[in-house]
Amino acid sequence: MKTIRLLLAMTFLSAIGFGQGSLSPAKLLAPATDSWPTYNGDYSGRRYSTLSKINADNINSLSLAWVFRAVPGGNLNAAIKSTPLVINGVMYFTLPDHVWAIDARTGRQIWHYTWQSQGGDHIGNRGAGIIGDWLFFETPDCHLVSLDLKEGKERWNQKICDLNQYYFASAAPIIAKNHVIVGVSGDDLDIPGYLQSRSPETGELQWQWNVEPKPGEPGSETWPNAEAMAHGGGMTWVPSTYDPELNLLYLGTGNPQPVIAGKGRKGDNLYTESIAAINADTGKLAWHFQPSPHDTHDWDAVQTPVLFDGEINGQSRKLLAQASRNGWFFVLDRTNGKNVITSEFVKTNWTSGVDAKGQPVPSVAKEPKLDGALVSPNQGGAANWHPPSYSPETGLFYVNSTRAFSVYYIFDDDEKPEGWGGNDRSGFSEGMMQAIDYKTGNVRWSHKWEGASGHYGVLSTAGNLVFTGDPSNNFVALNARTGDALWHANLGAGVSNGPITYELDGTQYLVVAAGDTLFAFAMLGGK
């Protein structure tokens, strides 16, 4: 079946035609070492590279190869949150309303595209999706735009959400067969979330999966009424992962709305705060698992669902793992959503236990109150959107974590409060890089950061290395097996995306963003 599905995908995509700079669909399934063709490197979300020319033995010889500062003009002040894509020696990355193509060897600009935005939240953009000779990206004012790779000229644009309802768009599109998968953002008004599939040729809508069910549909029993569902939230602002053999997209959904005051939405509020498996061809829900039922702490469960095959109790299983914002680590059978492991990866205090499905049970005592409730983790979460990594070589799941507390309080006790209906104030926090054993859920090692906590993307490689950022604006390399610090470079600003690596002309490059600048590192001078 896997072979048949791959052949069908190849048949469709061959009709697109592949020019000299184009992306072959095979690289999305098993990327070559000279590319980073999609948001997580491949469909799995592992952010693991088989490259090892840069390794634990020679890391101290790493040098700066080039620097590229993105200067979009105007009042845009956003950091580079996008993961750069590398295809045939060209790197593509985004800021809100902007796309650049640069030489991946030198950092020289090839072209720069600017979208004339009509508004929207310019908080960040997580990148582009590419297939064939076509690039796709989302804009803050709710459009999906397609460009040609060679010159950056616009092919088409399509509206994917309603700016007047305070939606905006920031996710990196994912291409699965003949589907461009796009999500939406927005917490300022009580609006429902959804995921869409768009045609690569025209941008026309193929299907839409709504996070909130309709009255009478499965999941509607977890809401008090139709009005609560119609305003229920659950944004889809981080890219999905994809299993081509099962033809399932794996999506983490955001928090319900109103965000803090949950009095008017009693129940678990499906399918917000869920890991959802969705058929890529039909948009139908195959299964779901809910890390944070009835969330009232803004703990979006959008963290990357990482896919890998592993051994559990002596048997090979198709697995999915997520280090969720609520402080809990989950391993699921990705064929059916059944729970395999549930464990804390930071100490939390918001649950009263774990139910038979492996889902944490919220403690009523930790619900936001008029006089406040002290809750761990804080609103920023034990993890956030920043991508984790999984190494098949070590069997460890790597995630930047934060242990922190917030006092959550409501200021509007009405069932239909104004805005979020409450807020939080954070206090003590500590940050750390953690390696989790997927077989047990235990933290194998933890590397604590000095100073304040923070969230940073992660990359692991066959060179026995893990790359990430720290609160002191350093780009850091750790030993993948022990967590020992091996190397760092101060970038002058915090790491703002997930690092990537690729090899061109025999040289392995590492690229990371800090603020508005891309930094490329390599072993120079034949070292």
State what each model feature region is.
Residues 1-5:
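Positively charged n-region of N-terminal signal peptides that target proteins for export
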Residues 7-17:
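Bacterial N-terminal signal peptides
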Residues 20-52:
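N-terminal pre-domain segments of enzymes
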Residues 28-31, 57-58, 103-105, 242-244, ...:
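Extracellular/periplasmic catalytic domains that process cell-envelope and extracellular macromolecules
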Residues 36-40, 78-97, 120-144, 168-192, ...:
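Repeat-blade elements of multi-bladed beta-propeller folds
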Residues 37, 43-49, 73-77, 259-260, ...:
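Short, solvent-exposed loop/turn elements at domain surfaces
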Residues 44-69, 73, 83:
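Non-catalytic accessory segments flanking enzyme active sites
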Residues 57-71, 99-120, 131, 143-164, ...:
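Extracytoplasmic/lumenal domain signature
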